[in-house]
Amino acid sequence: MATTTSITTTYAGEKAAGYISAALLSANTIENGGITVKPNVKFKQVIKRLSTTDLIADGSCDFAATDTVTLDEKILQPEEFQVNLNLCKSDFRDDWDAISMGYSAFDNLPPSFQEFLIAEIIAKIADKNEKNIWMGATATFGEFDGLVALATADATVNDVVGTTITAANVIAEMGKVVDAMPSALYGKSDVKLYVAQNVYKAYVRALGGFGANGVGAAGYEAKGNNQAINSLLFDGVEVFLANGLDSNYMYLAESSNIFFGTGLLSDHNEVKVLDMADIDGSQNVRFVMRFTAGVQHGFGSDIVLYTPA
C-alpha cells in the first residue's frame, strides 16, 4: 500500500497575503490595470472627493476667496467572505502526476501537490471575483455590490439606455457612451471604455469590414477579420475588455475613479488545506480561505453606464 503524505497546511494573517493576492488580484480587471486597488483596508476606507468651481480670478491687491470648495466622501468597506471546499485527492492526482512527470503543456510546476490544489482553487476564485467587481449584488450569497449596482443606485451617473449589441450596430452604440462622457474627461490618460465580451467581439468584427460602418470592405488597415484584439481605441478612448460585465453592458470611467478594496494584511485572512486522511481515513482534502473584498466609485458624474433595455 502506498504511503499517504499529509498535506495539511495553514497560512493565517499576513502569511496568507500571497495566496489572497493571487486569488483576488488576478481578476482580469485588476490584473490589467482597469481599477485602482486599495490593498490594506482593515475595515473601511474613506474616499475623499474634492470639487471646485471658478478657481482663477482677476488679480488684485487683496486676498479674496474666489472659489466654492465642496468636500464629501464615499466609503469603501470590503465585506468578509469565505471559501469552504471538500475535495477528493484522487480527482487531482492524474493532473498532478502529468505535470510532475513532464507530460503536460504547463511550464510552471507547483512545488508540491498542496500548492497545486491551492492554485487550482485560486484560479476559480479569481474568476468569481472578476464577476463580482462588475455585476455583484450584496444580496446574493457570496457577492458584494459591484460597480454596475453602485452606478445604478447613483443618480449622478450618466445613464445610457442600450440594446442588444451586434457587429452592425456596435460602433453607433459605443458612440452613444462616448457622447455621454463629460467633456472634462475626454483626453484624460486613464479614461477607459469598459465593455462586455460580446461588445468587444462585435467591435473587432466591425473593424474587419462592414459597408455601413465606414471602414471599407477590407476592414481597418485593410486587414479584414485579421484584426488585433489588444490596445483597441474608440474615438481616442481605450477600449477595455471587462470579462466580468454581462453581455451588452458598457461602462466608461477613469480607472482612478473606481476602487477595489481588500485587506491583504488583515488578521482575518486565512488559507488552510486540511488533509482528512489522518482524521477519518478518507482521501478528502478540505480547503478553507477567508478574505475581504469590495468596490466603490468616486464621482458618479464622471461615469457613464450603458445598460441594455
Give the label of every model feature segment.
Residues A2-A57, D145-A168, V204-A309:
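Sequence/fold signature of self-assembling virion shell proteins
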Residues I133-T138, G187-A196, G216:
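Short coil/turn segments at secondary-structure boundaries
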Residues D95-W96, E130, A202-V204:
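Short helix/loop capping segments that flank catalytic or ligand/cofactor-binding pockets
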Residues E80-Q82, K188-D190, N284:
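Extracellular structured ligand-interaction cores
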Residues K89, A151, Q197-V199, F291:
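Short, flexible loop/turn elements at secondary-structure junctions
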Residues I56-F116:
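Long, hydrophobic/aromatic-enriched structural stretches that serve as scaffold segments
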Residues A98-A180, T307-A309:
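Alpha-helical scaffold segments that mediate packing/assembly in large oligomeric complexes
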Residues A172-F210:
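Ordered core of a single globular domain
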